[in-house]
C-alpha cells in the first residue's frame, strides 16, 4: 500500500493486454479511503471501451470467443493480486524493504495459489465470473474457527513492523520531520489494524457476495437492450481515461469499482428486499457515487422500488380485469340472437374508463396512408422548435432502385457501386424517419444520449444515440439509433444522418465513443443542400406507420397498407435508465 500524509491511498490496478510482463499488472490511479469506507468490485471485466465478461459469463462461453479468452488470461492468473490491491492495497516501501520482503515470503505464493485454484474451479466447474470473484474473496480472507488464518497472521507481522518503525525514529531527524514521520506510520498502523478483525474480514466477503449476486440478477433479469442501456450510461473508464488518455485507455483491461460505507450497505441489504439492493447496485453502475449513498438515499431508493412494484401489481390487476371482461363479452355475444341496438350506460362508462386509462398511459400519433397525420388536439409545449431534414436522410424514403441510382452518381464514394441487394438491406436500417416524432418532442432527452460534438470536413457536428430493437419479420436486432446533426447558417438544427446500427453488448462501449463517431462519419456535408422542414415531413403514398410512446419506450410500427393487421417492421427505442 502506498500511503500519503493524512491517510492511506489505494491504487487502482489494470492488467496490461499488450505487453505481458511478469505480473501483467500496472497500478495507475489512486484514491483515498475514508474511515468506514470500503471498495467493492463489480464482476464486469472491460477491455478499453468494451465489456468482455459479464457476471454470468462461463468458461464455456469464453471458448466460443478466442479473442476474449486471450484478453482475459492476465486477469485469471492475477485475480487474487487484483482483489488484494482493491481491498487492501499494495506494499508500503521502506529503505530496508522489510514489508516487501514480508509480503513476498508470506503472501505472494499464497495469492498465486488462490488464483490457480480458483481458475481450475472456474474452468472445470463451469462457474460464472461472479462466482470466481466470490471465491477469490472467500479464500483470501478466510479465517478458521479460532480466529486465525493466513491473513490474520500476516496482519500481525505487519503491525509489529509498524510498531518497530514508530519506536525507532531516526535520530538525525529534526522535531518537525519526526512529527510527520510519527503521524505517517501511526496512520498506516491504524489502517492495517482495522483489518485485524474477523468481523471486518467477514464483512468484506459478505459485501462482495452481495454485490456479485445483485449484478448477476441484473444481467439475468434485463433484456439485452436494457443491459446495453445500462453500460452506455455508466461512468466507466473515467479515471482511467483521465490518467492514460483516450487511445491508451482503449487498449487496457480493468474492473470497475465503487467506494461505499460497508455498514450502511450491509444494513440496507438486511433491512430491505433484494430488489432494493439490486437497485442500489444499478445506480452505482449508472454513475452514482458510492460515498454519497447514505441511509436517507437508501430510503429514497426503497420508496422508488415500492412504487414500481405497486405499479406492476396495478397493471397486472388491470390486465386480468380486461381479460375477464373480454371473456364475458364473448360469452354474451354467443348467448344473444340479435345484436342490441342501444348501448347501456354501464358499457358507456366502461368505454370511457378505457379511453381515459389509455390516454394516461401512452400518447399515440399515427401517420395514415399517404402521410396524413392524425391530430391529437394538443399543441407542442416547446421541444426542438427548428428542425430540418437533410437530403441524405430523405433519400431513404425512395425505392431501392432510385436510392441506388442516386448513390451511384453521388459524392460519397463508400456508397458508389453497391449492389441492389445491399441497398435493400441498408434501406431497412436507414428508412426510420418516424424517429423524427421523438427527436422533435420534449421527451427526446429521456431517450437519446448526447455523445458530444466532433469536427470533420470543416463543420462541427453533434451525435445523439439511443438504444433500440429493430424487428423485421422474424429477425430481432438489438443496436443503437444514431442521429447526426449540425447547425445551419440560421442556427437551425439539421438532421444529416439517421440510422439503426446493429450492435451487441460487447461493442456498445466502442460504438458510443467519440472516436467511433468521427471515424464513421462522412468527410464532407453539403450544408448548402436544400433541406426539408421536419414539421412538413410525410412518407410517400402507400406507406403506413404508427408511433406509440409510453413510460419506457417509443415504438414505430410499419404496417402493410393492404392489410393493416400485418406488421412489416417495428422499431422500439428504449427510455434511458432512471437515475435516482
Swiss-Prot record:
Residues 308-330 have a biased composition (Basic and acidic residues). Residues 331-340, 372-384 have a biased composition (Basic residues). Pfam families: DUF1609, DUF3654. Residues 308-384 are annotated as: Disordered. Residues 351-363 have a biased composition (Acidic residues). Belongs to the UPF0329 family. This is UPF0329 protein ECU06_0080. The lineage of its organism: Eukaryota, Fungi, Fungi incertae sedis, Microsporidia, Unikaryonidae.
Amino acid at each position: 500500500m502506498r500511503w500519503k500524509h493524512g491517510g492511506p491511498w489505494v491504487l487502482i490496478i489494470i492488467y496490461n493486454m499488450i505487453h505481458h510482463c511478469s505480473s501483467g499488472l500496472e497500478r495507475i490511479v489512486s484514491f483515498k479511503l475514508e474511515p468506514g469506507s470500503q471498495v467493492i468490485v463489480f464482476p464486469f471485466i472491460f477491455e478499453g471501451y468494451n465489456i468482455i465478461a459479464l457476471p454470468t459469463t462461463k468458461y464455456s462461453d469464453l471458448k466460443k470467443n478466442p479473442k476474449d479468452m486471450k484478453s482475459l488470461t492476465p486477469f485469471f492468473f492475477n485475480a487474487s493480486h487484483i482483489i488484494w490491491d482493491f481491498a487492501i492495497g499494495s506494499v508500503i516501501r521502506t529503505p530496508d524493504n522489510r514489508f516487501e520482503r514480508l509480503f513476498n515470503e508470506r503472501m505472494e505464493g499464497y495469492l498465486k495459489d488462490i488464483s490457480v485454484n480458483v481458475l481450475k474451479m472456474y474452468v472445470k466447474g463451469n462457474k460464472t465470473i461472479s462466482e470466481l470473484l466470490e471465491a477469490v474473496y472467500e479464500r483470501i480472507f478466510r479465517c478458521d474457527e479460532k480466529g486465525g488464518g493466513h491473513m490474520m497472521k500476516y496482519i500481525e507481522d505487519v503491525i509489529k513492523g509498524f510498531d518497530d518503525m514508530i519506536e525507532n525514529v531516526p535520530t538525525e531527524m529534526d522535531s518537525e520531520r519526526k512529527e510527520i514521520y510519527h503521524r505517517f506510520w501511526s496512520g498506516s498502523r491504524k489502517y492495517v489494524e482495522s483489518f485485524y478483525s474477523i468481523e471486518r474480514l467477514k464483512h468484506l466477503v459478505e459485501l462482495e457476495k452481495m454485490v456479485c449476486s445483485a449484478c448477476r440478477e441484473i444481467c439475468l433479469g434485463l433484456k439485452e437492450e436494457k443491459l446495453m442501456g445500462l453500460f452506455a450510461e455508466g461512468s466507466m473508464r473515467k479515471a482511467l481515461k483521465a490518467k492514460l488518455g483516450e487511445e491508451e485507455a482503449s487498449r487496457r483491461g480493468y474492473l470497475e469499482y465503487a467506494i461505499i460505507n460497508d455498514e450502511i450497505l450491509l444494513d440496507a441489504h438486511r433491512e430491505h428486499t433484494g430488489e432494493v439492493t439490486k437497485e442500489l447496485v444499478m445506480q452505482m453502475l449508472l454513475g452514482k457515487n458510492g460515498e454519497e449513498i447514505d441511509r436517507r438515499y437508501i430510503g429514497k431508493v426503497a420508496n422508488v422500488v415500492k412504487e414500481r412494484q405497486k405499479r406492476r401489481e396495478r397493471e397486472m390487476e388491470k390486465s386480468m380485469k380486461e381479460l375477464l371482461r373480454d371473456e364475458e363479452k364473448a360469452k354474451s355475444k354467443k348467448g344473444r340472437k340479435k345484436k342490441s341496438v342501444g348501448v347501456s350506460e354501464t358499457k358507456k362508462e366502461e368505454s370511457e374508463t378505457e379511453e381515459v386509462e389509455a390516454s394516461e398511459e401512452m400518447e399515440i400519433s399515427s401517420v395514415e396512408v399517404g402521410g396524413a397525420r392524425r391530430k391529437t388536439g394538443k399543441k407542442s409545449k416547446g421541444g426542438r422548435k427548428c428542425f430540418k431534414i437533410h437530403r441524405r436522410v430523405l433519400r431513404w424514403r425512395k425505392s431501392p432502385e432510385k436510392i441506388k441510382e442516386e448513390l451511384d452518381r453521388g459524392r460519397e464514394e463508400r456508397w458508389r457501386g453497391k449492389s441492389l441487394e445491399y441497398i435493400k438491406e441498408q434501406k431497412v436500417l436507414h428508412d426510420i424517419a418516424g424517429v423524427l416524432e421523438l427527436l422533435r418532442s420534449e421527451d427526446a432527452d429521456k431517450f437519446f444520449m448526447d455523445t458530444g460534438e466532433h469536427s470533420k470536413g470543416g463543420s462541427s457536428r453533434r451525435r445523439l444515440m439511443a438504444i433500440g430493437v429493430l424487428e423485421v419479420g422474424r429477425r430481432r436486432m438489438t443496436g443503437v439509433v444514431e442521429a447526426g446533426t449540425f447547425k445551419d447558417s440560421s442556427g437551425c438544427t439539421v438532421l444529416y444522418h439517421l440510422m439503426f446500427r446493429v450492435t451487441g453488448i460487447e461493442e456498445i462501449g466502442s460504438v458510443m465513443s467519440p472516436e467511433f463517431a468521427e471515424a464513421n462519419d462522412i468527410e464532407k456535408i453539403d450544408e448548402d443542400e436544400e433541406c426539408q422542414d421536419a414539421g412538413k415531413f410525410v412518407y410517400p403514398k402507400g406507406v403506413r406507420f404508427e408511433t406509440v410512446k409510453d413510460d419506457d419506450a417509443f415504438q414505430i410500427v410499419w404496417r402493410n397498407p393492404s392489410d393493416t393487421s400485418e406488421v412489416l417492421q417495428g422499431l422500439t427505442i428504449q427510455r434511458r435508465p432512471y437515475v435516482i
